[in-house]
Amino acid sequence: MNYCDKINYNIYSTEKAGFEEMVDKLLAQLPRDKQIFRLAFFGTPSDNEQYVSRRILLREKVRKYYGNHEPVLTYVSQPPLNGGLLLEAHMYTPDEGDHITYKHIGTFPYVLLENGSGRFLFAGGFHGDVINFGIEQQSKEVFKLVSDLLRKEGFPINSIIRQWNYIEQITKFDGEDQHYQIFNNARSDYYAMTTWENGYPAATGIGANLGGILVDLDAALFSNPDCYTTPIDNKLQVAAHAYSDGVLEAAHCKKTTPKFERAKSMTFGDRELVYISG
């Protein structure tokens, strides 16, 4: 079966109730016949102290629920459109050619998939100390975590094909420095450690009410010549990584551009999966 048929994304919601009850109801909706790679919860904590305590509770519940098959866990402080808590699940239906390993780096779970197409990494929930540090320090801490994981598993930086970046109060300024630009500068510094001949990742870079800096990513190393990635841009738009200084805010007198493509496709033989940025 083709990778495009085996990977699956779904959204689950539940009506407003106590936080623990909502988490239990969402976990109970997840299918038992699939491998769960990523769980991204979206909710509305009242402050960062409650955000951290709920993130810890989520981790405990997910670990108890999945045991040695703990998926990537992300908690985003954004109000769901409907219901009290929303869950985005990334799932996979393996066949005999797939080898799936659930691992940890520090306290962060991640998933490795290996098959005839290549090696695939699903990771995230990467965050810094949202209580005691600002956006700049958190951004540096997050990319240090990303770097450590990629190095550990043998994935080059430019193997990242999709990245999700959630930034607390994204347009807010710390003095003269905008949160989004602070994050962009940290990302640019990290990405500058390699070359990107095949384009930057597709990416989400959006605001969150709370939670500091939060990053998820997918990476791929292909071993089959019929499998590859292709960057996609819109000719009616300026590429994000080519923005002029006029549309960027400065942070520490730096105006590095957002490093992402409008989309990126993964080809598997005669099939394609497209990651759309936004």
Model-assigned labels for residue ranges:
Residues M1-W164, Q169-G278:
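N-terminal presequence-like segments and the immediate start of the first folded domain
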